[in-house]
């Protein structure tokens, strides 16, 4: 007679086998009723013997107790986004860039996949067992959705097969099939619940439930498309090979993944999928095209937030016609005046659209747009609504001219348009309430100073009540003053004050990004910080010297130089420093006085380190006389390559620069 342990093992193995056949192979061999019977039998046995329940048992998908809030998971390897192309000409230009950059006659084979319209997730397996899952978040840090992901039947709690790595991070898309989406909305209408606009919103809402038991009731599914962390094992040296290996281990992979031998075959695949799109049973918004060879991927490397070896070829956005009821003018963080069309609300690609960007005065002139016109609206990239064209044949008689303002609609300051620029700007600077609001929202944002709990509505009120005029004023706020805002109790106010205090400790790169200098994004801010090291050096830099920083041209250099030349900006920076904003200062050491293999060398770190943080490694290298740079150039002496090193490693190899790994770095640090 079999023991209870043997019965449980057999039932779990049988259920996992049938889950694999159903979700991965799409070839179920037993009726749903038989699957349900086996599940009931397993559940009954586990109820009688709770001490024998294992975390990877199929019964453990039903969901744990509700969470108070999501915790954060830092991605060991950043989850980058993809660059987009929207037409054949742009794709062919991308194809040419890839061929040119490879600088060889070696053939490029493309692996093409469906671009699923769902939620990107990262799933970590240790010794084949699912241990954690996270959303993409900002690419560096995501939300811990482990409990919810465990409820998705398509995702195995335990991988099966041979040669499974000790640590394997699988990346893919969680999405909701059309049938499941329609059923959720049908149930919601019947019970008075929330009706979702589209399957993507429904998938996101289902996956980000604090109560996993709700997620368990939603028919979410999953396809994997890539890998993050890989330790203690190997994977094939092609992208398609890796996907097929994932499938062999029990992970679901789309059956539409296709290998294309040329750009022409890629375009044929794109048009085939576009034709089949309505019958797939789930939403996609394009195809993803990747260089199949991992060696070529490594050679091509990355730009700031995207790989050079992949692109998303988006489908033309859905379009609808409606009427322009008015045109209003919004003022952005840098004073840019943006015309916005107020529309007769219309559903476009599952979303009710009532506003659309008109970009600038030139665009209004190009369109020949008048208030009252009938227009075609497109959700560009299925996200940002825009006016495509005016239906002139149906123009009403009572249309009105759109008059671009000569004075700021918010503060009344002059509006000027610099020759050669399409954008007109308010000249009011921070005396303009709109610019002040947007500048402050940028300053406190997650990727800038990261002030937790200070949302847009709080900033709006602070500006409207004249409590805050510059970023430095934020750090002068008290809990007592904040309680004067709507829906702000003493406890919430104190939390904001505490968050502001915590935000004072930052990095030089984050501080530069938070200042909101025109054209200075995160990557440029990091480059400037790494190159100059100190605020004083950056403030004193000439336009010519600024252009020595990688990826900084004359336009960006001019904006940076002009920003620091402006006395009011320097005053704000002085106030911020006086309020206690600080970051680790580089230690200046005479390299000639140090007996170290790193002394006097320009060193670049790339990839992720496992034994110490990047910041700790940089600090130790500087202590030993090295200059740590943010990018690889002919002046670089040494590159330290951690896990998943990308474009910097490729460039170092191309330039013949010495490369060492983390183990060798640690040995030299200790020598």
UniProtKB/Swiss-Prot annotation:
Which residues does the UniProt record annotate as the domain BRCT? 593-671
Q: Which GO terms describe its biological process?
A: DNA repair; DNA replication
Q: Which residues bind NAD(+)?
A: 32-36, 81-82, 113, 136, 173, 290, 314
One Pfam family recorded for the sequence:
Nlig-Ia
What's the cofactor? Mg(2+); Mn(2+)
Binding site residues for Zn(2+): 408, 411, 426, 432
An example of a GO molecular function for this protein is:
DNA ligase (NAD+) activity
Active-site residues, as the UniProt record annotates them? 115
Return the SUPFAM superfamilies for the record: BRCT domain, DNA ligase/mRNA capping enzyme, catalytic domain, Nucleic acid-binding proteins, RuvA domain 2-like
Q: InterPro entries from the entry?
A: BRCT_dom, BRCT_dom_sf, DisA/LigA_HHH, DNA_ligase, DNA_ligase_AS, DNA_ligase_CS, DNAligase_adenylation, DNAligase_N
Q: Which reaction does it catalyse?
A: NAD(+) + (deoxyribonucleotide)n-3'-hydroxyl + 5'-phospho-(deoxyribonucleotide)m = (deoxyribonucleotide)n+m + AMP + beta-nicotinamide D-nucleotide
Q: Does the keyword Transmembrane apply?
A: no
* Any GO CC annotation of this UniProt entry: cytosol
The catalytic activity of this protein is classed by the Enzyme Commission as 6.5.1.2
Which leading EC class covers this enzyme? ligase
What are the alphabetically sorted keywords of the record?
DNA damage, DNA repair, DNA replication, Ligase, Magnesium, Manganese, Metal-binding, NAD, Zinc
Alphabetical list of NCBIfam families matching this protein = dnlj, PRK07956.1
Tell me its family. Belongs to the NAD-dependent DNA ligase family. LigA subfamily.
What does the function comment of this entry state? Answer: DNA ligase that catalyzes the formation of phosphodiester linkages between 5'-phosphoryl and 3'-hydroxyl groups in double-stranded DNA using NAD as a coenzyme and as the energy source for the reaction. It is essential for DNA replication and repair of damaged DNA.
Question: Which protein are we looking at?
Answer: DNA ligase
According to its UniProt entry, this protein's organism is Escherichia coli O81 (strain ED1a)
Query: Mind giving the lineage of the organism this protein is from?
Result: Bacteria, Pseudomonadati, Pseudomonadota, Gammaproteobacteria, Enterobacterales
């Amino acid at each position: 007679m079999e023991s209870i342990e043997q019965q449980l093992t057999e039932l779990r193995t049988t259920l996992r086998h049938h889950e694999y056949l159903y979700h991965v192979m799409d070839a179920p061999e037993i009726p749903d009723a038989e699957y349900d019977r086996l599940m009931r039998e397993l559940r009954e046995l586990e109820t009688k013997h709770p001490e024998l329940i294992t975390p990877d048992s199929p019964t453990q998908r039903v969901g744990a107790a509700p969470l108070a809030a999501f915790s954060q998971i830092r991605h060991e390897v950043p989850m980058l986004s993809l660059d987009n192309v929207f037409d054949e000409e742009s794709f062919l230009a991308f194809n040419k860039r890839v061929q040119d950059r490879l600088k060889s006659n070696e053939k490029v084979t493309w692996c093409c996949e469906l671009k699923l319209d769902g939620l990107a997730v990262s799933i970590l397996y240790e010794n084949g067992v699912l241990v954690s899952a996270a959303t993409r978040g900002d690419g560096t840090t995501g939300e811990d959705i482990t409990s919810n992901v465990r409820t998705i039947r398509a995702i195995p709690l335990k991988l099966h097969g041979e040669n499974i790595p000790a640590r394997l991070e699988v990346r893919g898309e969680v999405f909701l099939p059309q049938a499941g989406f329609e059923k959720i909305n049908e149930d919601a209408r019947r019970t008075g619940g929330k009706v979702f606009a589209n399957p993507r919103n429904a998938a996101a809402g289902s996956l980000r439930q604090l109560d996993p038991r709700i997620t368990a009731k939603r028919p979410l599914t999953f396809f994997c498309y890539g890998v993050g962390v890989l330790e203690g094992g190997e994977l094939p040296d092609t992208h398609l090979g890796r996907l097929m290996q994932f499938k062999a281990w029990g992970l679901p992979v789309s059956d539409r993944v296709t290998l294309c031998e040329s750009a022409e075959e890629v375009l044929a695949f794109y048009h085939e999928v576009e034709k089949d799109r309505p019958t797939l049973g789930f939403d996609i918004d394009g195809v993803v095209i990747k260089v199949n060879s991992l060696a070529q991927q490594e050679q091509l490397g990355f730009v700031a937030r995207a790989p050079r070896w992949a692109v998303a070829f988006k489908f033309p956005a859905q379009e609808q016609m409606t009427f322009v009821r008015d045109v209003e003018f919004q003022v952005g963080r840098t004073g840019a005046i943006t015309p916005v069309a107020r529309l007769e609300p219309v559903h476009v690609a599952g979303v009710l659209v009532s506003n659309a960007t008109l970009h600038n005065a030139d665009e209004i002139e190009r369109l020949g747009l008048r208030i009252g016109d009938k227009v075609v609206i497109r959700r560009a990239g299925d996200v940002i609504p825009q006016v495509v064209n005016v239906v002139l044949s149906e123009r009403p008689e009572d249309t009105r001219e759109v008059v671009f303002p000569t004075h700021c609609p918010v503060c009344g300051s002059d509006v000027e348009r610099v020759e050669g620029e399409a954008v007109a700007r308010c000249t009011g600077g921070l005396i303009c309430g709109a610019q002040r609001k947007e500048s402050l929202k940028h300053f406190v944002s997650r990727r800038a100073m990261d002030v937790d709990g200070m949302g847009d509505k709080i900033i709006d009120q602070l500006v409207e009540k004249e409590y805050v005029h510059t970023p430095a004023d934020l750090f002068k706020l008290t809990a007592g003053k904040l309680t004067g805002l709507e829906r702000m109790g003493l406890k919430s106010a104190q939390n904001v004050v505490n968050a502001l205090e915590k935000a004072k400790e930052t990095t030089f790169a984050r501080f530069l990004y938070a200042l909101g200098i025109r054209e200075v994004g995160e990557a440029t801010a990091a480059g400037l910080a790494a190159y100059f090291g100190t605020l004083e050096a950056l403030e004193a830099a000439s336009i010519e010297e600024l252009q020595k920083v990688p990826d900084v041209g004359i336009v960006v250099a001019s904006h940076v130089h002009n920003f620091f030349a402006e006395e009011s900006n320097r005053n704000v920076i002085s106030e911020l420093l006086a309020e206690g904003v600080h970051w680790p200062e580089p230690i200046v050491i005479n390299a000639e006085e140090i007996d170290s293999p790193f002394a006097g060398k320009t060193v670049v770190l790339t990839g992720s380190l496992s034994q110490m943080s990047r910041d700790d490694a940089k600090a130790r290298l500087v202590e030993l006389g090295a200059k740590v740079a943010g990018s690889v150039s002919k002046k670089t002496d040494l590159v330290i390559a951690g896990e998943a090193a990308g474009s910097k490693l490729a460039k170092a190899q191309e330039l013949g620069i010495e490369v060492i790994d983390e183990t060798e770095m640690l040995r030299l640090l200790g020598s």
